[in-house]
Design a protein with these regions (language model features):
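An acidic/histidine-cluster motif and surrounding catalytic segment
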Residues: 1-109, 113-233
Length: 233
């Protein structure tokens, strides 16, 4: 059984391709499925794609906003160019659309991920979670040590996303640069975007909107390479 796996890569960016190649090389002995480069959406395509898919960006860029539908605070991300943040969302969104049509799910990576341990696909398939993060939170998310400690204190191989903040703050995977997503998870995300509008992918994919459906590997399979973000610059 070959499960689709994609690494989101900026086509004409040397650093992005170099990092993606490192990820692909690191799969030896850790990941049995072929990883294909997926051309990242670039800012110049944002308007046309948002229009094509009838999407509306519904996330603040400068000041925090209380979302009345969900009761959660939406805090702006550090982003110099708004279209880069939306383009990042669109790259994941288009892969969610593909995943929703698959039978066995999909692995989605950003170019800054790299393998550090073997991925046990059977374990992922057997989990009740629809989306499972592969990443070590350290260096990949806010309150990383709190997140890491909560995961490591569990006895389970796949741990539910821990609570590291108030319920009014979206909380999800430890960085969205490496995760396994089942068709049911993709369908749910597409519905959430339709209902609440387009948010950053790691905000809409939160435990508050997907209760009981998000998990994290206790033995992390990937970590971030520690390169500069292409979204915040």
């Amino acid at each position: 059984m070959n499960i689709p796996a994609y690494v989101i890569t900026i086509k004409d960016d040397p650093l992005s391709n170099e990092c993606a190649d490192k990820l692909i090389m690191s799969r030896a002995g850790n990941f049995e499925h072929e990883i294909t480069k997926f051309d990242a959406i670039i800012p110049e395509r944002v308007i046309s794609l948002m229009t094509l898919h009838n999407l509306k960006w519904n996330y603040p860029m400068s000041e925090p906003v209380l979302d009345m539908q969900t009761g959660m605070w939406k805090h702006p991300y550090k982003t110099a160019v708004t279209e880069k943040r939306i383009a990042c969302f669109l790259s994941h969104y288009l892969l969610w659309q593909q995943c929703a049509k698959t039978r066995d799910g999909m692995f989605i990576f950003e170019h800054d991920a790299i393998f550090i341990n073997k991925v046990e696909v059977g374990l992922l398939n057997q989990s009740k979670c629809d989306i499972i993060g592969l990443n070590d939170p350290r260096g990949a998310t806010r309150r990383a040590m709190q997140y890491h400690t909560a995961v490591q204190n569990s006895k389970h191989a796949i741990v539910g996303v821990p609570k590291i903040d108030t319920d009014q703050i979206p909380q999800g995977l430890p960085g969205n640069s490496a995760y396994f997503i089942k068709p049911a998870g993709a369908v749910k995300l597409l519905r959430l975007v339709n209902e609440y509008g387009a948010w950053p992918n790691d905000a809409i994919m939160c435990k508050q909107l997907m209760p009981g459906k998000l998990g994290v590997l206790r033995q992390y399979a990937t970590k971030v390479q520690g390169v500069a973000s292409t979204t915040t610059l």
